[in-house]
Amino acid sequence: MFPTRVLRSTLQKLPHRETVPMAYDLHMPQRSLFQNLNEKHTEPIVFLHGIFGSKKSYELDSKMIAHGTHTPVYTVDIRNHGQTSHAMPFNYDTLAQDVKEFCHVQGLKSVKLVGYSLGAKISMLAALKYPELVKSAVIIDNAPVKQPYIELYMKQYVKSMLHVLEEAKIKTTDKDWKNKASDAMKKFLPNGVIRKNLLVNLVNKKPDGFESPVVNFDEGLIQFLNPIRQMEEAAVKDVTDWPEESTEGLKYNGPVKFIKGLKSPFINEEGMTKIQDIFPNNEFANVNSSHDILDQRPTEYVKIICDFFNAHRYESAPSNTIIGHKDFKTTIDMRV
C-alpha cells in the first residue's frame, strides 16, 4: 500500500504575490448620548487573528471592543485565511506589508492594532516598520523573537488538519461531518478548545465569493478554507520565526500593552528582554491562562483592551471633547 499523504513535490504551488487585499468586517460602536464624544474615527482599531483563525473567530469580542472604546473595529482575514487570497510568501515582512496596504486602501492614516499570536507578531512588526501608521497596539501573548520551542504546537495543528483531509476524508453529504472531523483531530489535538477554533475554517460547501487555486470543492469532501498542504512548512517555520534583519535597530516608542498568559510559553525571559528593548513604552497585564487567552479569559482580555485604548485615546484630543474636562461641552444627541 502506498501512503495516502500527498508528496510535497507534486503539490500545486500557490501564486507569489507581494501584497493581497485583505477581506474584512467593520464593527461600528453604538451611538453615544454625547454627540461630541471623541470617538476618533480617524484612528480605528484593526484586529489581527492567530494562525488558522479568521475575522469571524472573535466577532462578538470585536463588537464589545468597538462599543467599549467608542471606536470602529476592523477584523481582517490574513492571507491564506478566511476570504483573503491564497498566496505566498507567508513571512512576517509580507504579512505586515499586507496590513500597511490594507490601511492605505481603506484610507486609514493612523490605526490602533490588536494582534493575537500570529497576529501579535504581525502587529509588532507593523509598529516597528511603520510607526507613522500605528498609534498604539495591544499584543496578546507573543514576543518579537524566534520561537523554535513552539514548533511542536504548530506541527500538531497541521497534522490534525491534514489528517482530516487525507485520512478521514469525510463527505460533504455526511450530516455529522463536523463531529467526525473533531473526532479525527483528537489523535493530534486532545484540547477541545483548539479543535473548535480550527474547525471554524472547515466547511462542507464552498462559501459565496471564495476562490482558491488549490482548495477543490469538486471532490465531494469537506475542506478547510486554508491551503493546508501548501502551508505545511510555512505554518511551522514562518510562524515561529521573527525577521531580525529587517528590524535591526528599530524601536517603537508608542504605547503598547502586552497581555501575557501566565501558563503560556510564548513570552519567555528572552522575549521579555527584547520587548523592553524595542518597545520601551510598554505595559503588561498578566492573566491566569494558557496561550488560549481569548477563549479562557474573554471578558478579562476585552476589558484590558478597552481600558488601555480609553486611557490613551485623549492624548491628542481637544480638551472640549474630553468628558470630565472643565472645557467639555455637554451637547447631548438624543437620536440613539
Curated annotation (Swiss-Prot):
Gene responsible for this protein: EAT1
Annotated catalytic residues: 117 (charge relay system), 141 (charge relay system), 291 (charge relay system)
Superkingdom, taxonomy of origin: Eukaryota
Coiled-coil boundaries: none
Stretches assigned to the AB hydrolase-1 domain: 44-296
Keywords: Hydrolase, Mitochondrion, Transferase, Transit peptide
Known function: Alcohol acetyltransferase that catalyzes the synthesis of ethyl acetate from ethanol and acetyl-CoA. Can also function as a thioesterase by hydrolyzing acetyl-CoA in the absence of ethanol, as well as esterase hydrolyzing ethyl acetate.
Organism of derivation: Cyberlindnera jadinii (strain ATCC 18201 / CBS 1600 / BCRC 20928 / JCM 3617 / NBRC 0987 / NRRL Y-1542) (Torula yeast)
Recorded family membership: Belongs to the AB hydrolase superfamily.
Transit peptide: 1-14
Reactions that this protein is recorded to catalyse: ethanol + acetyl-CoA = ethyl acetate + CoA; acetyl-CoA + H2O = acetate + CoA + H(+); ethyl acetate + H2O = ethanol + acetate + H(+)
Gene3D superfamilies membership: alpha/beta hydrolase
Molecular functions (GO terms): acetyl-CoA hydrolase activity; carboxylic ester hydrolase activity; transferase activity
Gene Ontology cellular-component terms listed: mitochondrion
Subcellular location(s) of the protein: Mitochondrion
Pfam families tied to this protein: Abhydrolase_1
EC number per UniProt: 2.3.1.268, 3.1.2.1, 3.1.1.-
Entry annotated with the keyword Transport: no
Name of the molecule in the record: Ethanol acetyltransferase 1
Main subcellular localisation: mitochondrion
